[in-house]
Swiss-Prot record:
Source organism of this protein record: Rhizobium etli (strain ATCC 51251 / DSM 11541 / JCM 21823 / NBRC 15573 / CFN 42)
Highest taxon above the source species: Bacteria
Pfam families: Ribosomal_L36
Family of the protein in this entry: Belongs to the bacterial ribosomal protein bL36 family.
Gene Ontology biological process terms in this record: translation
Key word Transmembrane helix present: no
Protein name per the record: Large ribosomal subunit protein bL36
GO molecular function annotations of the record: structural constituent of ribosome
InterPro entries: Ribosomal_bL36 (IPR000473), Ribosomal_bL36_sp (IPR035977), Ribosomal_L36_bact (IPR047621)
HAMAP family documented for this protein: Ribosomal_bL36
Sorted UniProt keywords: Ribonucleoprotein, Ribosomal protein
Gene Ontology cellular component list: ribonucleoprotein complex; ribosome
């Protein structure tokens, strides 16, 4: 999982990326290709 300050560019890497908010943190998840997972930090 990548940890980035800004997720805007990471969201555009794949069309199936979804932005989710869990416990105050923002994540990008991708069920088809999990290597695109990321968290804002």
């Amino acid at each position: 999982m990548k940890i980035k300050n800004s997720l805007k560019s990471l969201k555009a890497r794949h069309r199936d990326n979804r932005l989710v908010r869990r416990k105050g943190r923002i994540y990008i998840i991708n069920k088809l290709n999990p290597r695109y997972k990321a968290r804002q930090g």
